[in-house]
């Protein structure tokens, strides 16, 4: 007989290991927690490691917020070799032994070109779609598609270390940034080509690698300890301003939007009712527009 699955609500932040797909992590976690409903917040390639938030129950409503949030990565780029996928899992398509002499000054000059608002072309080996078909499938079929460039923001780009044919960087970036494309572009800017050989996501939204859980360690926990590892839905918005409703404002917020003269409000706002987190709203031009509602029970519902 199938075990009744639990209606869990919240977020578990996993430190994904190399070789596992994001969907495999999702299925393992769903099994470990015996959860009814679960979803991840954007894939990490199997070769990548690091922060992968998994949403349970009502938290799946806000997965898009995490998908759209800023990210931070540690990336290692191998110079002088290009691959069709832009990473170590692809086929080698070009080699160039003429790697320039790398110095801190030279690398900083090149990296400066990639800081701030830039235009990036996503890699063909990606889940983006063209006429309903994932680009990676078209790439495997040998079909060349013109991929549209997109505007992204590299907030921080720090050189961590380098040697004669590789460099390690820390990248803090906006949604939609492909680190493989960044590796390719940096290789081109250095005149020798390059590809990504290691990638660790160290932050996704408010969640950092320091507090992420290893799957193997999670397996050894008691079920009560597993439940205690679930972060509340509210934790996704912990850095957002708060607005506390009074009774006469509820109807306006729920139905039409609420005008609120509050200078501290901006963008996404946490809504409280009787000291309980009940919704998120967007504040724009003096008006709160509700976006998502949540029940009071954040963890387990009967």
Swiss-Prot record:
Pfam families cross-referenced by the UniProt entry: TruB_C_2, TruB_N
UniProt keywords, alphabetically: Isomerase, tRNA processing
Catalytic residue positions: 45
Recorded catalytic activity of this chain's protein: uridine(55) in tRNA = pseudouridine(55) in tRNA
Keyword Isomerase among record annotations: yes
UniProt keyword tRNA processing, yes or no: yes
Record-listed E.C. numbers: 5.4.99.25
CDD domains assigned: PseudoU_synth_EcTruB
Single GO biological process annotation from the record: tRNA pseudouridine synthesis
GO MF terms, alphabetically ordered: RNA binding; tRNA pseudouridine(55) synthase activity
Function: Responsible for synthesis of pseudouridine from uracil-55 in the psi GC loop of transfer RNAs.
Recorded family membership: Belongs to the pseudouridine synthase TruB family. Type 1 subfamily.
Descriptive protein name: tRNA pseudouridine synthase B
Organism expressing this protein natively: Francisella philomiragia subsp. philomiragia (strain ATCC 25017 / CCUG 19701 / FSC 153 / O#319-036)
């Amino acid at each position: 007989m199938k075990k009744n699955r639990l209606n869990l609500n919240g977020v578990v932040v996993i430190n994904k290991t190399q070789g596992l797909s994001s969907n495999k992590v999702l299925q393992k976690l769903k099994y470990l927690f015996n959860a009814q409903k679960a979803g991840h917040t954007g894939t990490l390639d199997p070769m990548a490691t690091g922060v992968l938030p998994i949403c349970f129950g009502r938290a799946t409503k806000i997965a898009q917020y995490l998908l759209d949030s800023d990210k931070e990565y540690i990336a290692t780029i191998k110079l002088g070799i290009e691959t069709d996928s832009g990473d170590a899992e692809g086929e080698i398509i070009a080699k160039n032994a003429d790697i320039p002499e790398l110095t801190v000054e030279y690398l900083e000059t090149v990296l400066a070109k990639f800081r701030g608002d830039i235009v990036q072309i996503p890699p063909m080996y990606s889940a983006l779609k063209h006429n309903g078909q994932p680009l990676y499938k078209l790439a495997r079929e040998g079909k060349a598609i013109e991929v549209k460039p997109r505007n992204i923001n590299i907030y921080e780009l720090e050189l961590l270390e380098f040697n004669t044919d590789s460099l390690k960087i820390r990248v803090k970036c906006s949604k939609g940034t492909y680190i493989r494309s960044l590796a390719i572009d940096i290789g081109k800017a250095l005149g020798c080509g390059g590809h990504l050989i290691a990638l660790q996501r160290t932050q996704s939204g408010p969640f950092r690698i320091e507090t992420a859980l290893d799957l193997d360690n999670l397996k050894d926990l008691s079920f009560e300890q597993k439940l205690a590892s679930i972060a509340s839905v509210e934790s996704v918005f912990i850095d957002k301003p708060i607005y506390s409703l009074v009774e006469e404002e509820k109807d306006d917020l729920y139905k039409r939007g609420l005008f609120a003269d509050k200078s501290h409000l901006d963008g996404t706002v946490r809504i409280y009712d009787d000291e309980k987190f009940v919704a998120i709203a967007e504040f724009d031009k003096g008006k709160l527009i509700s976006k998502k509602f949540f029940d009071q029970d954040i963890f387990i519902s009967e």
